[in-house]
């Protein structure tokens, strides 16, 4: 990024607090260090979470999803997250090997509040743990084991502002190009032929249907 002349960049937390203000009374008290019944119930009903990891090159945020409860609460301070088949780039897993700090954001469709869980992640192929994460008779090859350092519920303001679950505000699916077309244009810098786009879209669709587990 090229910093434009005359743009003020905050470089210390004192400046941040001066503009943003102090945390609201009581908000820091909600941070706890282990699972209890409400966080367990939320995770058991969540079919989707975002996984944040980092490396020396930067940060990654990756979606994770399956049937509600796909993330397993092993005990009060440990979560197991299955590594389902993907594109095998394995950015998140590579990051975890080198930088164990990770964050999770759990969502439940229709609810505007979320659950944030932070801690240290480790990769494991321990068979008893993998069996706990089996789905559709398929056992994952790997799992992420999260050692929890803090967790807390996050307020619903972002979801209220965005109207994420309000179907009347959802855009038509064809308002954007297909995934295949967008990827090809990013790679080649120009629109693909219809034949190539159709072939890529078909391959992506088949992969999404046949290689979920």
Question: Predicted segment positions?
Answer:
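Binding-site signature for planar aromatic cofactors or substrates
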Residues: 1-213
């Amino acid at each position: 990024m090229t910093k434009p002349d005359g743009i003020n960049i905050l470089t210390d937390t004192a400046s941040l607090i001066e503009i943003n203000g102090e945390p609201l009374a009581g908000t820091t008290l909600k941070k706890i260090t282990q699972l209890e019944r409400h966080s367990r119930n939320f995770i058991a009903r969540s079919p989707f979470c975002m996984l944040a990891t980092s490396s020396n090159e930067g940060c990654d945020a990756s979606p994770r999803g399956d049937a509600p409860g796909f993330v397993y609460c092993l005990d009060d301070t440990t979560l197991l997250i299955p590594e389902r088949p993907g594109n095998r780039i394995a950015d998140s897993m590579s990051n975890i090997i080198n930088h164990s700090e990770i964050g999770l954001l759990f969502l439940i469709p229709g609810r505007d509040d979320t659950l944030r869980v932070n801690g240290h992640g480790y990769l494991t192929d321990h068979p008893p743990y993998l069996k706990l994460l089996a789905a559709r008779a398929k056992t994952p090859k790997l799992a992420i084991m999260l050692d929890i350092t803090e967790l807390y519920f996050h307020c619903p303001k972002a979801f209220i502002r965005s109207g994420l679950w309000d179907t009347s505000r959802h855009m038509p699916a064809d308002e954007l190009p297909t995934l295949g077309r967008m990827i090809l244009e990013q790679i080649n810098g120009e629109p693909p032929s219809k034949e190539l786009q159709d072939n890529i879209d078909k391959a992506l669709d088949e992969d999404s249907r046949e290689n979920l587990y």
